[in-house]
Amino acid sequence: MIIMKIALNGFRNYEFETVEFAPGTNVISGQNAQGKTNLLEAVYMLSCGRSFRTRFDRELVGFGYSGADILADVYSHEREQTINIQLRPGQGKKILVNGVKKTAGELADTVNTVLFCPDDLNLIKDGAAVRRRLLDNAISQIRPRYAEYLSEFNRLYEHKTRILKDWRDKPSLLETLDEFSDGMCRASAQLIRYRAAFSARLDQAAAPIHKDFSNSLEELEIKYKTVSTVKDPFASAREIYYDICEHQEKHRQAELESAQCLTGAHKDDLEIFINGTAARSFASQGQTRTAALSIKLAEREIFLAETGEYPVLLLDDVLSELDTKRQEFVLNRIGGGQTLISCCEDEGISKRTGGRVLFISEGTIK
């Protein structure tokens, strides 16, 4: 799949700008705070309808504008298609694909993206929330139902959290606590099945990439960790649901005392091992960066296997954070699909990839 052209109107620092991309590598250069990440953010939104930097659409609208528009011509599934995302703070968001109204979750049927930014280099060392976000973002693009379950789970989690925090002042809130707990158990069961399956594929895809990078000196292993009472995360949703309910029953009193949700998929994590040792605790910075690179490149391969097309790869100022060896490893692995690379200076990337160079200054693309 290819983003052929994108037009931005009132989006971030872009007043009105149109840019055409090459089908292969595109190097987007410019000094800091000129709009490089904003452009990648707009492309990312074509796959999911949301930003990777903020939860609030109003922050995407440029100063002095009442709304923002993203209009793109894309080539996917062997045909040209158009995507139009209209952001109107206070009025909601409107998404059109080929002129037909769609939900944000349906965008993934047209465009898929894999984003790699500097924060992802800390994927191994950071907290579990970062790794859950990786799972959520990836699975939502290839399994639309997952996004629905995730949205439902988050809604229930927020309601239950408020009950646990306020029940002492309003004891009547406890009348609905079990209902929300049961709903969370049901939604968790679905999320766990999807996450377990994707984690297994990620393990299989990332291991050979990491082995190749380390000259066969390191073995990467990814294990999915979920609610302790879940005996088999690959079992049916019903079986997993009963296992989670067991955990919920054991921790109900502890939840009331701590005012926290202790049971559910919000505690999930990916455990990363290098040569059998926990990478988060014992791996060097170089090892964890290699593992993070391997995982992100594996995500790209999974999308290819799932859809028959490479997703659009977005490298947001990440190559500057890597040494020459790791830069070369990434650049040698990104053939076959479209890639957008942002950087402060070209630094020979375009020559090494044969890519097109775009220069951004104060929201103007040249």
PLM features per residue range, with description:
Residues 122-123, 129-178, 182-185:
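Long, charged N-terminal accessory/stalk domains
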Residues 1-31, 171-312, 321-325, 329-332, ...:
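Conserved NTPase motor "head" modules and their coupling/switch loops across ABC/AAA+ ATPases, GTPases
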Residues 316-318:
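Walker B catalytic acidic pair
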